[in-house]
């Protein structure tokens, strides 16, 4: 195994470890928020309640910061993985060219030399296939669009948008349509995040309150910044500019479709056109 192959395996192992650590945090953050909310609703909180509230608030800030730090770390390691993949492909290409050059110089070669060349070629092909298999472990699926939303908005809007996009021939990642019994929901969600061309972010009051939705949004935001092209397609539903700015100022500058201005059919058509144009 070459130095680059070893490096790639090490980077991918580190990436998977960071992803596992990130996966644990949204649920922990949600539990802390609910605990804080329960205490805040008490009309006459006890001194014990107040101490618990202070402790929970500190833990919440710590875990939110940890999640943000892991997101940055994950983006960096993914960038390094892409660079290593490119360098590995170049290395393999150089090796193949060397083999081709040797074959050209030995058109009259003897059996021993030819056997050696063929053996080397087989070894390179085998290594190439092993690396491709390892690299593609996270690329098993490919979706045109990921629907990031709160489950509370699914029935009225999201499922209808999903069905109409599928009718247009697009491959859509909607949780209820891709989750399989017995499989990890978190791993499936992460695969969708990593392997979707675009994400439709259905911004609503429910979305803003959801810890999982925030995790999805931050993951796609890091992808958009790192990959330097548009990935996030926002839809506003019963939210104001102030609501969106408070959630994340990055979204305010993005042109968004508002459900008060566009029908479901119009929203679907505009999403479809963006995806189709990106493939041309």
UniProtKB/Swiss-Prot annotation:
PANTHER family: TIR DOMAIN-CONTAINING PROTEIN (PTHR32009:SF39), TMV RESISTANCE PROTEIN N-LIKE (PTHR32009). Residues 22-94 form a coiled coil. The keyword Lipid metabolism does not apply. Residues 141-275 form the TIR domain. Its main location: secreted. Keywords: Coiled coil, Hydrolase, NAD, Secreted, Virulence. This is NAD(+) hydrolase TirS. It comes from Staphylococcus aureus (strain MSSA476). SMART domains: TIR. The gene is tirS. The active site is at 216. GO terms for cellular component: extracellular region. The TIR domain mediates NAD(+) hydrolase (NADase) activity. Self-association of TIR domains is required for NADase activity. GO terms for molecular function: NAD+ nucleosidase activity; NAD+ nucleosidase activity, cyclic ADP-ribose generating; NADP+ nucleosidase activity.
């Amino acid at each position: 195994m070459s130095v680059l192959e070893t490096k790639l395996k090490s980077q991918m192992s580190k990436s998977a470890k960071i992803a596992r650590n990130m996966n644990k945090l949204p649920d922990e953050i949600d539990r802390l928020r609910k605990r804080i909310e329960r205490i805040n609703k008490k009309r006459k909180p006890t001194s014990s309640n107040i101490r618990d509230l202070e402790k929970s608030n500190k833990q919440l800030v710590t875990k939110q910061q940890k999640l943000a730090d892991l997101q940055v770390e994950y983006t960096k390691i993914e960038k390094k993985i892409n660079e290593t993949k490119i360098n590995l492909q170049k290395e393999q290409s150089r090796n193949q060219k060397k083999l081709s050059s040797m074959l050209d110089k030995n058109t009259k070669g003897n059996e021993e030399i030819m056997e050696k060349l063929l053996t080397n070629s087989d070894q390179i092909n085998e290594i190439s296939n092993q690396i491709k298999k390892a690299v593609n472990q996270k690329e098993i699926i490919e979706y045109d669009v990921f629907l990031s939303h709160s489950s509370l908005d699914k029935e009225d809007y999201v499922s209808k948008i999903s069905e109409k996009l599928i009718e247009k021939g697009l491959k859509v990642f909607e949780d209820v349509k891709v989750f399989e019994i017995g499989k990890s929901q978190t791993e499936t969600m992460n695969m969708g995040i990593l392997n979707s061309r675009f994400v439709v972010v259905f911004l609503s009051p429910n979305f803003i309150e959801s810890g999982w939705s925030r995790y999805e949004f931050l993951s796609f935001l890091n992808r958009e910044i790192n990959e330097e092209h548009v990935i996030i397609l926002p839809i506003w539903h019963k939210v104001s500019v102030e609501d969106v700015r408070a959630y994340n100022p990055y979204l305010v500058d993005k042109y968004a479709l508002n459900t008060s201005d566009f029908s479901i059919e119009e929203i679907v058509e505009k999403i479809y056109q963006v995806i189709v144009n990106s493939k041309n």
